[in-house]
């Protein structure tokens, strides 16, 4: 659902019938249950007196990839961090509205942010493995959460899920910091999925990687969505078109001006503002 916009972003315009990204490879996979897992209603966020998000309303579907795109400073990362309450750590941040995970407002007083983050994992822009062994990077969260299952088996499962096991299974005692950048990011993904969350948030996870490593992470995202709901922030239009099922377009002022199937957003943008952004005329 799009927020209000003076240009009426839901209006059809024949001038946008030609795809602004002609020839761009796009995801054609149909997946997901169709159920809503995350529901945002009238989310407004301020940092002190500066408003970062303005009246954001959207429903994120289960077991699909939802891409958040927009120019720098438009609030997409702020919205991502609302989902697992990472913004709680910023004293100057104030949030209004409701953000529900399976119908439960994550900002209710009885919600433990730590427990929430077990259900909503996160992968950051730059790989940030712990200064520990590869094994301990993945096992650490399980141990502090009191996981009573087979930790060795879960570590292997997470590393396989992150497409890393075959590369590191004979060096689990070595430091995660010794891995390549792309391997480190996949290690961070393994760490994020080890507690078996429902949602995986990714804040520009390939922006610090070379093209080959970035491609491996994209392939991995396509596999992860079989088990998890993925929400990814990206500045890369081609990446959003390739890997996502839904795309949300944020523009300056923290407005959500379009949220629709990715093919629709790129082939038939609903407003001139959106077309100008995705074709590189601004942003």
Curated annotation (Swiss-Prot):
It is found in: Cell membrane. ATP binds at residues 70-77. It comes from the Archaea. It catalyses: phosphate(out) + ATP + H2O = ADP + 2 phosphate(in) + H(+). Residues 1-35 are annotated as: Disordered. Its EC number is 7.3.2.1. It is a peripheral membrane protein. Residues 1-16 have a biased composition (Acidic residues). SUPFAM superfamilies: P-loop containing nucleoside triphosphate hydrolases (SSF52540). The keyword Chaperone does not apply. It holds the Pfam family ABC_tran. InterPro entries: AAA+_ATPase, ABC_transporter-like_ATP-bd, ABC_transporter-like_CS, P-loop_NTPase, PstB-like. One of its GO terms (biological process) is phosphate ion transmembrane transport. One of its GO terms (molecular function) is ATP binding. Keywords: ATP-binding, Cell membrane, Membrane, Nucleotide-binding, Phosphate transport, Translocase, Transport. Belongs to the ABC transporter superfamily. Phosphate importer (TC 3.A.1.7) family. Part of the ABC transporter complex PstSACB involved in phosphate import. Responsible for energy coupling to the transport system. NCBIfam families: 3a0107s01c2. The complex is composed of two ATP-binding proteins (PstB), two transmembrane proteins (PstC and PstA) and a solute-binding protein (PstS). This is Phosphate import ATP-binding protein PstB 1. It comes from Natronomonas pharaonis (strain ATCC 35678 / DSM 2160 / CIP 103997 / JCM 8858 / NBRC 14720 / NCIMB 2260 / Gabara) (Halobacterium pharaonis).
